[in-house]
Every structure is written in structure tokens, then in C-alpha cells.
């Protein structure tokens, strides 16, 4: 019989072990046995909590997307009366939070995006994450721009965020936060009438 209160601890162990395995060998080569070994548990524990590898991968991506949401919301909540420019920079900062730009997180995101084209549940998670980013950006641009311009600016800033992130992920080098901040700030200033 499982010990009370162990589920959150075990789930965290397994998600962390999954990220480690993806970081080291990639999503497709990360086996249940490798993940269980890294977590110090039997493969049966993975089946118990997640049913199979896909369930574990989905839980891992839910965890990463939850960390992204929290990183953005924490920054926005710190600026309740902030200008559109400040709040847009907060959204950018959340997307470049340490939880999102570690080697393990970046590799997991890349694998997640690739797998989402073939797995409906991962596709749904990817769409939710993508829509959330665009919605947040458009909402802030909309404070100072007409709807169509706000949508265009939001789409452009989302593409810039994704592009900077993707270039860093594929380079194998850490994201240059100073450069990312400079480029996104410039984009925001170009699109807001009163930055």
C-alpha cells in the first residue's frame, strides 16, 4: 500500500528524471527504465502514476507549461498599474525565465513541439500555450492600439520571442538575455505610440 502524501513527491521525482533523460538522450531515446532508474523507483511506479511513457511526457509538458504560466503571471501581478510597455516586458521576461531556458527545459520544449504534430494531447497543450502567449500580448498592445494593429504587434512579438528562444535552443548556448531584452524592447517601442 502506498504511503500517504507520496504522490506529489513521486510525480515530481519522475518529472525531474524525465527532464534529465530528455536532456541527456532526447525524448525518443528516453526509456521508462532509464527514467525510473534516474528517479530511483521501479518502472511499475511510472505505470501507477502515469500509465505509460506518453502519460509521463504529457505530465512533464504540463509541468513546464505551468511553470511558464506562473513565471508570466508573477511578473504581471507585480505590475498591476504598469504601462503596456512594462507589462509586455514582463510577459517577455516570463518567457525567458530560468525555468524555460535551462538546457533540459529547452530540449523538452523542442521535443514537445515536434511530438505535438503527431500526438493529439500534446498538440492541445501546445495550442493552449501558444494561444495564451498571443492573447496576453494582444491584450497589452490593445491598451494603446486599435484591435488590428494590436493583433499584428502581438503576433510579431510572439514570433520574436519564439524565434529568439528557438535560435538559442538550437545553438546549444545559453540564451543571451541582454540581447533578447534589447530586441524585444525595441520591437515594443516601435509598436506603441507612448512607450
Curated annotation (Swiss-Prot):
**The keyword Transcription regulation belongs to this UniProt entry's keyword annotation:** yes
DNA-binding region per UniProt: 31-50
- Where in this chain does the record put each HTH tetR-type domain? 8-68
Q: List the disulfide bonds.
A: none
- Give UniProt keywords alphabetically: DNA-binding, Repressor, Transcription, Transcription regulation
Pathways per UniProt: Amine and polyamine biosynthesis; betaine biosynthesis via choline pathway [regulation]
Q: Which GO terms describe its molecular function?
A: DNA-binding transcription factor activity; transcription cis-regulatory region binding
Q: Name one GO biological process term.
A: negative regulation of DNA-templated transcription
The job of this chain, per UniProt, is described as: Repressor involved in the biosynthesis of the osmoprotectant glycine betaine. It represses transcription of the choline transporter BetT and the genes of BetAB involved in the synthesis of glycine betaine.
Q: Which PANTHER family match?
A: HTH-TYPE TRANSCRIPTIONAL REGULATOR BETI, HTH-TYPE TRANSCRIPTIONAL REGULATOR RUTR
Write the protein's name.
HTH-type transcriptional regulator BetI
Instruction: Give the organism the record lists.
Output: Klebsiella pneumoniae (strain 342)
Amino acid at each position: 500500500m502506498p504511503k500517504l502524501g507520496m504522490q506529489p513527491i513521486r510525480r515530481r521525482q519522475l518529472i525531474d528524471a524525465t527532464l534529465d533523460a530528455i536532456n541527456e538522450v532526447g525524448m525518443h531515446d528516453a526509456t521508462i527504465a532509464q527514467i525510473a532508474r534516474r528517479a530511483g523507483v521501479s518502472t511499475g511506479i511510472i505505470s501507477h502514476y502515469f500509465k505509460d511513457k506518453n502519460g509521463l511526457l504529457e505530465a512533464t509538458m504540463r509541468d513546464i507549461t505551468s511553470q511558464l504560466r506562473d513565471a508570466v503571471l508573477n511578473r504581471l501581478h507585480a505590475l498591476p498599474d504598469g504601462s503596456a510597455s512594462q507589462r509586455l516586458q514582463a510577459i517577455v521576461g516570463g518567457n525567458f525565465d530560468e525555468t524555460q531556458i535551462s538546457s533540459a527545459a529547452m530540449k523538452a520544449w523542442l521535443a514537445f513541439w515536434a511530438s505535438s504534430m503527431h500526438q493529439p494531447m500534446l498538440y492541445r497543450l501546445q495550442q493552449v500555450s501558444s494561444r495564451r502567449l498571443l492573447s496576453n500580448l494582444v491584450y497589452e498592445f490593445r491598451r494603446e492600439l486599435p484591435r488590428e494593429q494590436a493583433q499584428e504587434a502581438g503576433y510579431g512579438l510572439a514570433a520574436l520571442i519564439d524565434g529568439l528562444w528557438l535560435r538559442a535552443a538550437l545553438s546549444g548556448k545559453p540564451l543571451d538575455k541582454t540581447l533578447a531584452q534589447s530586441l524585444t524592447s525595441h520591437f515594443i517601442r516601435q509598436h506603441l505610440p507612448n512607450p
